[in-house]
Amino acid sequence: MSSLRGLGNIARRWRELNGVSYWKGLLDPLDVDLRNNIINYGELSQAAYTGLNRERRSRYAGSCLFSRKDFLSRVDVSNPNLYVITKFIYAMCTVSLPDAFMIKSWSKAAWSKQSNWMGFVAVATDEGKEVLGRRDVVVAWRGTIRMVEWMDDLDISLVPASEIVRPGSADDPCVHGGWLSVYTSADPESQYNKQSARYQVLNEIKRLQDMYEHEETSITITGHSLGAALATINATDIVSNGYNKSCPVSAFVFGSPRVGNPDFQKAFDSAPDLRLLRIRNSPDVVPNWPKLGYSDAGTELMIDTGKSPYLKAPGNPLTWHDMECYMHGVAGTQGSNGGFKLEIDRDIALVNKHEDALKNEYAIPSSWWVVQNKGMVKGTDGRWHLADHEDDD
């Protein structure tokens, strides 16, 4: 998140910044408080990437590296004291998906053969409530793992979304079958997915709404790539089925593929108290996919990282789609007819956190964020072993 000073106006303007008026007059040029608000949620979305164990040699591949208690500080969120994580989300999928979506351990003693850690639910602390102006409940969904080649391998079939969209709100709302399967799949024999990711989140939303029923609350959903698609479905589900109890629900999604058909868009647009801002990087190919039969929901904010003087030109599909590059673009965009100037003091080294996007003259290594020694620790016997998992309290 940006500095606390940068978040200073959010408490006063949060309804406007979360889209009560559909962000009219705030996008071109981009309002500075909205920049900070977007990056606030963007960092939580990035955290769901950073916290994932990607090492397939580990028995914990596909799980979270850190415990809930220390998670936000361990993944280096700028203001970790604003939120406390109340629940981790786990998902499985009953349709075939490319490896970019679900990480499977090569170990015979894998922590789970089906499930992956897919994000978290968090709620504003008392300190966060002061800064943010209300008790904000956040759901952050993890996205795909770096690769974009999955677009060539993924079935784009639409399936009915009758579970998600309330009856009568549209004629025949349908969503991408793969996105819906990740959201709704469950297995009574599974340790982590006896409940689907959907019901893990909805039940936690209900619990937190009941806990803070006498306070002003909001629900904010965020995600990038696959996580953006899941965030769109989740936000629609929460409002369509009344889990928000009339408190406003906003989604901030980054690099989102398309989610559903025109009837799903119609259902989304007709839902009360529901807003969605799609942040899209002009050269990124993912938001253009799938094409046939799909329609965009929500309000679009277009950025163009190609205008940044800090990034290598022309870039490549990985850097165009990278979440840190998206936040860099939000920090510096000057609107559709402008250039690029960082309006927020956001460290340019972050764009190389997981990619090789920054110009070499800045002397920042590529893909520099790694767990110390890749999780290897030296035991008292002098031998090294992999210890890349913290038990969740």
Swiss-Prot record:
Q: Name one Pfam family in it.
A: Lipase_3
A molecular function (GO) term: phospholipase A1 activity
Where does this chain mainly localize? Answer: cytoplasm
Which positions are tagged coiled coil?
A: 200-220
Alphabetized, the UniProt keywords read:
Coiled coil, Cytoplasm, Hydrolase, Lipid degradation, Lipid metabolism
Subcellular localization(s) per the UniProt record:
Cytoplasm
Q: Name one GO biological process term.
A: lipid catabolic process
Active site residues according to the UniProt entry: S225, D284, H321
Q: By its UniProt entry, which InterPro entries does this protein fall under? A: AB_hydrolase_fold, Fungal_lipase-type, PLA
Keyword presence, Lipid metabolism? yes
**UniProt-recorded name of the protein:** Phospholipase A1-II 1
Identify the species of origin: Oryza sativa subsp. indica (Rice)
